[in-house]
């Protein structure tokens, strides 16, 4: 999914603000046939600190216990995190489960998967409504100068004159490139403190450096734009 390439100002496309990487050409089947450790979906209180929501179970797929997941990023792009992870964490209300994934693949604009211990359609249907999380460490590695959205949230944004412009609060995909939502403190019409937002295209002509270690993004952007 999208990264920052100041050389040619390109950006990949994504469909949500949790993570993003460049478009990837890939076979429609990922990890098919790779066996996971045996076990059924199990209740868990041990929730990983780096869990990132990447989709939701919306239906069963077929008759043999596969589930269909609507991803927060295009399958075959950001959806690669779902395909790459061998364990998913599921949440529906107060219910939390951990499940190993035996097989997964893309299907149209969704990801379909076979959780261990889910053997028929009825069991798969019972999983509808679960939000799906994977660990950040299970995301596929990116090429140089590319970034997942989740890693940009909270970074400070300054311009080339070191003027603070705010912090990244989210990302938007407009179908052509990504856009940073940058929140900053402001004063409301009633004189009370509030927050305002500026939108900065995440393209090379504006984004000059992204320093994740320093948690800072430098942009060619003025405070009064």
UniProtKB/Swiss-Prot annotation:
Pfam entry (one): RimM
Keywords: Chaperone, Cytoplasm, Ribosome biogenesis, rRNA processing
Principal location listed in the UniProt entry: cytoplasm
GO molecular function, one term: ribosome binding
Gene3D superfamilies attached to this UniProt entry: PRC-barrel domain (2.30.30.240), RimM (2.40.30.60)
Organism in which the protein naturally occurs: Burkholderia orbicola (strain MC0-3)
Protein name: Ribosome maturation factor RimM
Domain PRC barrel: 144-225
GO annotation terms (biological process): ribosomal small subunit biogenesis; rRNA processing
HAMAP family on file: Ribosome_mat_RimM
Quaternary organization: Binds ribosomal protein uS19.
Membrane-spanning intervals of the chain: none
GO cellular component, one term: ribosome
Domain notes for this protein: The PRC barrel domain binds ribosomal protein uS19.
Family that this chain belongs to: Belongs to the RimM family.
Highest rank taxon of the organism: Bacteria
Subcellular location: Cytoplasm
Physiological role: An accessory protein needed during the final step in the assembly of 30S ribosomal subunit, possibly for assembly of the head region. Essential for efficient processing of 16S rRNA. May be needed both before and after RbfA during the maturation of 16S rRNA. It has affinity for free ribosomal 30S subunits but not for 70S ribosomes.
């Amino acid at each position: 999914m999208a990264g920052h390439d100041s050389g040619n100002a390109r950006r990949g496309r994504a469909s949500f603000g949790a993570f993003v990487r460049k478009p990837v050409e890939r076979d429609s089947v990922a990890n098919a046939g790779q066996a996971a450790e045996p076990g059924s979906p199990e209740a868990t209180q041990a929730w990983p600190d780096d869990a990132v929501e990447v989709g939701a179970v919306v239906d069963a797929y077929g008759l043999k216990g596969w589930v269909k997941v609507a991803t927060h990023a295009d399958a075959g792009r950001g959806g690669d995190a779902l395909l790459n992870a061998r364990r998913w964490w599921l949440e529906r209300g107060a219910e939390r489960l951990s499940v190993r994934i035996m097989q997964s693949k893309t299907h149209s604009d969704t990801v379909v998967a076979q959780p261990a211990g889910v053997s028929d359609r009825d069991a798969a249907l019972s999983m509808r409504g679960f939000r799906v999380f994977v660990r950040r460490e299970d995301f596929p590695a990116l090429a140089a100068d590319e970034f997942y959205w989740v890693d940009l949230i909270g970074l400070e944004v300054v311009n080339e004159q070191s003027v603070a412009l705010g912090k990244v609060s989210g990302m938007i995909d407009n179908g052509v490139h990504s856009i940073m939502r940058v929140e900053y403190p402001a004063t409301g019409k009633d004189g009370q403190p509030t927050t305002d937002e500026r939108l900065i295209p995440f393209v090379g002509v504006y984004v000059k450096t992204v320093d994740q270690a320093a948690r800072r993004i430098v942009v060619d952007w003025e405070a009064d734009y």
